Amino acid sequence: MLSTMQTVGAILMLSIVFVAGTKRHACDSKYSEVTPTHTMCLTDNANAVAVTLTQEVKVQIVRMHNVIRATVNDAANMMKMEWDDRLAAVAQKWAMQCILGHDGFANHAEPDLPGYVGQNVGWSNYHMTFPDVVDLWAAEIEDYEYGVWNDNTGHYIQQIYAEASRIGCGQSACGEDRYFVCNYYKSTMGNTPYAQGSRCGQCPNSCWEELCDCTSGPDACCNGGSLNIDTCECQCPRLWSGADCQEKQCPDHDYEDMCDYPDVVNNPEYWCQFSNIRSDCPIRCGDCP
């Protein structure tokens, strides 16, 4: 078998954006409002041909990721992953640019999912299948050490990021070249992709084949909410409620006395830029009537 570099160009350059000079076209306002350079607002490369991923391939991609995740022996909070068509649409659009690299966090953000979306990219100049590429990303485990960042293990770290519960992928052909893109929600952050402990240690009530299965729960917890992976329910900040923390529950008065301090009263524009003040003083900060 050829080496990774011989078979597929697989790089993780999250800080580099390659959309400069790419023509743009009108797109759904939900994307352009995130940023005018959003990937969904780009024009496809004239040489790009979409490679349709069959349902069988989608299922295989998800299954492979879940097997990879379930084999992490010391992960206490590893979530089961599922397919997401929204992520897949953006991944496909980036694949149609025929660019070996990443489009940047803001450019592949999904407006319906708060927080960062991660991305793995691969390239091949001969016939490879998507499962082949997923395997190559996973092979980076050979260089992986928990808690130690290694530029050669970025794809694998994204695959095993505990909170990455949704995935969508796209593929294109540009002449003899093949481009593979998978977008993940959420994006890995740092070099500790999961909490160490016994398998399903943090989710005994939702455990499924060594993974925390919240696929029947909300897609995301909005407005600063967090997902309890044991109950698969959102834990919402006090101003918010509902299954995904999008129902505002305004109080009759602000929560803290400090909201009436002269400094806050006289200069709310300044003080309300701080998240704790905005949370404590929803009326003073104009979030509630």
Swiss-Prot record:
Organism phylogeny: Eukaryota, Metazoa, Spiralia, Lophotrochozoa, Mollusca
Keywords of this entry: Cleavage on pair of basic residues, Disulfide bond, Gamma-carboxyglutamic acid, Secreted, Signal
InterPro entries, per the entry: CAP_dom, CAP_sf, CRISP-related
Name listed for the protein in its UniProt record: Cysteine-rich venom protein Mr30
Modification comment: Contains 11 disulfide bonds.
A GO-annotated cellular component: extracellular region
Signal peptide positions (record): 1-24
4-carboxyglutamate: residues carrying this PTM: E33
Pfam family, one: CAP
